Amino acid sequence: MKNEKRKTGIEPKVFFPPLIIVGILCWLTVRDLDAANVVINAVFSYVTNVWGWAFEWYMVVMLFGWFWLVFGPYAKKRLGNEPPEFSTASWIFMMFASCTSAAVLFWGSIEIYYYISTPPFGLEPNSTGAKELGLAYSLFHWGPLPWATYSFLSVAFAYFFFVRKMEVIRPSSTLVPLVGEKHAKGLFGTIVDNFYLVALIFAMGTSLGLATPLVTECMQWLFGIPHTLQLDAIIITCWIILNAICVACGLQKGVRIASDVRSYLSFLMLGWVFIVSGASFIMNYFTDSVGMLLMYLPRMLFYTDPIAKGGFPQGWTVFYWAWWVIYAIQMSIFLARISRGRTVRELCFGMVLGLTASTWILWTVLGSNTLLLIDKNIINIPNLIEQYGVARAIIETWAALPLSTATMWGFFILCFIATVTLVNACSYTLAMSTCREVRDGEEPPLLVRIGWSVLVGIIGIVLLALGGLKPIQTAIIAGGCPLFFVNIMVTLSFIKDAKQNWKD
């Protein structure tokens, strides 16, 4: 019995430091929002302007790593001795499901507006050239390049899971081949895990900060309930309580069903937008945008704008690369776990093709719809953002479609379910990472899960209180900096161990 309690207890060295650090930062922010915004702007400017190039080189190097895996000595190596756990169709569907979060719905609907109103390469705002590049840049930021970087890390984690038979719930577990067991399980490993957890907490709080206003704006549109910060806080509280009830009552099967419903509803809603918005235009715009992407790809890869200093690569490319970096470990662990029995080449190709198709469909359909609404003067996005905020502008891109009430109900349900599953996943991941020897498939303690969901909810509320996108972007970039190095160490550790232990 004591042994069982030990297994389900918290791990103090990785539980309390992130809790204290995040708690102090939240307190300092709430204490003086104006001063916090000044610091946020300074941090954002420093990291993106001084170190933005490093994120760009990181993505390029990881892309070369993907080619090495696909065509190198490990291409035909199998990740485990068992046959694949899931059929290829189910495997790809699970990948798609991982892409349909409310944060993705947020960016997919509004991102193109920012690209055409503040375009790269010195183009005139809202010009034909800016519109031609708008979707192309979305395809760049959410296309093969970032998924290729995830492929490398997914192979690394799958190798440690299924070839080396290691229990990996924190990144330090994978660093034994690189730094030795003493350091991996000592102070160095603890520091690495704490960096990972603090960054992950902020990333999840950021996702909640993006998702919540979509739900509350839907409520205003459907029920006439005014959207306020207090309503955001109430909705987040309800999600936390609902998550606690689901966990306490053993309703995790219900949460998994909700996740499946989210995926099917995503297909349905995207299909609806595709049909009624303008299928012919969407396909033509996508085709043209792929050509623009191929034409400008070298410039996009290395674009830092040091002369004109327009700020586009810092505000978007570096931000998104930090976004990908910060979620890399969590996402790669999930993708690795569903890829048991596949070869390295299968995993790399499957991820890049399957996940790129998922994100490209989302961004093409939603972005094209937004551009059409702008061109036809059906909605005035700058005015909506200035008066009501970004979330209202996104809601109006959906409300402008035919059968607006039915469309809004569908979008409301989709966002609500997506956020319920987000809160559940947040609490589960953080609880698993901060508890002692909770093994895969076991449930971490209820109070720990509730505690982490509360903290993530608080961060979401704090970011919403700060207002605007800059605090959200800064939280991602600041969190991405330490994980930049952690991801590299995990990659190097895999390469070193594979050379020694994964021979013919």
Curated annotation (Swiss-Prot):
Membrane topology of this protein: Multi-pass membrane protein
Cell compartments where the protein resides: Cell inner membrane
Transmembrane segments: 10-30, 51-71, 92-112, 143-163, 195-215, 231-251, 263-283, 316-336, 347-367, 398-418, 446-466, 475-495
Bridged cysteine pairs (disulfide): none
InterPro entries: BCCT_CS, BCCT_transptr, BCCT_transptr_CaiT
Catalytic activity: 4-(trimethylamino)butanoate(in) + (R)-carnitine(out) = 4-(trimethylamino)butanoate(out) + (R)-carnitine(in)
Gene Ontology CC: one annotated term: plasma membrane
Keywords carried by this UniProt record: Antiport, Cell inner membrane, Cell membrane, Membrane, Transmembrane, Transmembrane helix, Transport
Superkingdom of source: Bacteria
One BP annotation, GO: 4-(trimethylammonio)butanoate transport
Pathway: Amine and polyamine metabolism; carnitine metabolism
Pfam family, one: BCCT
Gene Ontology molecular functions: (R)-carnitine:4-(trimethylammonio)butanoate antiporter activity
Protein function: Catalyzes the exchange of L-carnitine for gamma-butyrobetaine.
NCBIfam families tied to this protein: bcct, PRK03356.1
Database matches in PANTHER family: HIGH-AFFINITY CHOLINE TRANSPORT PROTEIN-RELATED (PTHR30047), L-CARNITINE_GAMMA-BUTYROBETAINE ANTIPORTER (PTHR30047:SF11)
Quaternary structure, from the entry: Homotrimer.
Similarity comment: family membership: Belongs to the BCCT transporter (TC 2.A.15) family. CaiT subfamily.
Protein name, entry field: L-carnitine/gamma-butyrobetaine antiporter
Gene name of the encoded protein: caiT
